[in-house]
Amino acid sequence: MRIAIDIDSTLHHYWDQLDRVSQKRFGVTLPYDGQVVWEVDLLKPSQLEAAVAETHTERHILAAEPYAGAVETVRAWHEAGHFIHITSHRAGEAHAATEQWLTRIGLPYDELYCSYDKVSRCEEIGIDLLIDDSPVNLEGAIDAGLRVATILHPWNRDICETEDVLCAADWTGLAAALEPVLA
């Protein structure tokens, strides 16, 4: 199977980084449990763009720690012969640091793609399954005929309850939920 896997809030807990940058730069706390929609409305669009850009600098990328079980699960899938496409809504300038991070954490992959056209890229390269936290990407992938899965977050809880999305609280649960799909 051809699997695409997002990075931020999928392979690692991104929200803490975004919150720290928001507090430092703008004095605005971004409570994780209160983020029940995809849009971050506590920041102005220009502030959010600046905060996200800062979290995608080399220093922040390399400081990220993967979720427990994420690397081991992806490694097992890769060793079982599944194609692993790592995809992130990051500017092209973040590619080298992202590649360095993936190497540092020991996550094997076949392709890394940093861009803002995630679902169309998945369609272009024949991805079967997208693992992502964004309800926008999950809906787009469903509409494109892909299977979808996610790590459960406050902002994607609704899509987990209303759409055909495999949802799990953590990577151990996600691996178990996807086992029959990947068999």
Where are the regions a protein language model picked out?
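Substrate-recognition "cap/lid" segment bordering the active-site pocket of phosphatases
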Residues: 89-142
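Conserved phosphate-coordination/catalytic loops
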Residues: 61-68, 116, 168, 172
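Hydrophobic anchor at the start of a short beta-strand
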Residues: 83-84, 109, 148
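Asp-based, Mg2+/Mn2+-dependent phosphohydrolase catalytic module
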Residues: 119, 123-124, 135-183
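Active-site neighborhood of HAD-like aspartate-dependent phosphohydrolases
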Residues: 1-50
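Short, acidic loop-to-helix structural element flanking the phosphoryl-transfer center
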Residues: 56-86, 91-97
